[in-house]
């Protein structure tokens, strides 16, 4: 894990972007997960160029800020998986929004219609090859088609709130690193994350 403190001014994110650009070409990891980095289209592009220099292309997973940068730069299709909640999915679905703050209201109000948002995100090339959409019912999507849904066990306090998506993304990355294909890894991660929530009660 590579960590850098950032209080919102972007200093830590820029330090981490720079570190990634310098070290990724020599990295031999099989999975790369990008999470809470301040979105920066220029730095995002530099990181992708560094990844291209790696000996073996890793599985690329993005959540939160880095997912935003991927969409904003028109590079969403370079990623193997995004892990959005419904609010983040609404941003991916809005082909005109340059930043989540500008997601159009009528799209935000469709947040209970995940399938429509998924279709729209893929139609405008703003989605990764796979999506693991977090919500009351998690949806696993491959190339625009929902291939699995996970809704049990249900722990309402865990549904798409801060922190639960982090554990889900971590489980997905660990399973991919262990050699699982992405779709079964996403299904298993969604189920395991829900079980963790139920057991933690």
Question: PLM ranges: what are they?
Answer:
Residues 3-78:
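Ribokinase/PfkB-type carbohydrate-kinase core domain
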Residues 194-201:
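Charged C-terminal helix
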Residues 4-8, 86-88, 153-156:
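Short, acidic/turn-prone active-site loops that include or flank metal/cofactor-
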Residues 91, 161-191:
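Short, small-residue alpha-helix embedded
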Residues 143-145, 149-151, 171, 175-176:
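Short, contiguous, well-ordered secondary-structure segments
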Residues 151-163:
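Short pre-catalytic strand/loop immediately N-terminal to key active-site residues, enriched for Gly-Thr
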Residues 70-147:
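Conserved phosphate/ATP/ADP-binding segment of small-molecule kinases
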């Amino acid at each position: 894990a590579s960590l850098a403190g950032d209080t919102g001014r972007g200093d830590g994110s820029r330090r981490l972007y720079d570190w990634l650009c310098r070290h990724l070409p020599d990295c031999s990891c099989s999975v790369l997960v990008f999470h809470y980095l301040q979105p920066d289209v220029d730095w995002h592009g530099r990181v992708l160029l560094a990844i291209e220099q790696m000996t073996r292309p890793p599985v690329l997973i993005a959540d939160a800020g880095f997912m935003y940068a991927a969409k904003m730069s028109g590079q969403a299709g370079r990623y193997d998986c995004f892990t959005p909640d419904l609010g983040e999915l609404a941003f991916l679905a809005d082909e005109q929004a340059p930043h989540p703050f500008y997601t159009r209201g009528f799209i935000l109000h469709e947040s209970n219609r995940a399938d429509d948002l998924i279709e729209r995100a893929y139609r405008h090339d703003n989605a990764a090859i796979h999506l693991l959409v977090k919500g009351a019912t998690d949806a696993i999507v491959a190339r625009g088609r929902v291939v699995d849904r996970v809704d049990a066990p249900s722990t309402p306090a865990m549904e798409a709130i801060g922190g639960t998506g982090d554990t889900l993304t971590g489980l997905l990355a660990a399973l991919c690193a262990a050699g699982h294909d992405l779709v079964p890894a996403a299904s298993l991660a969604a189920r395991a994350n829900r079980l963790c929530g139920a057991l933690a009660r």
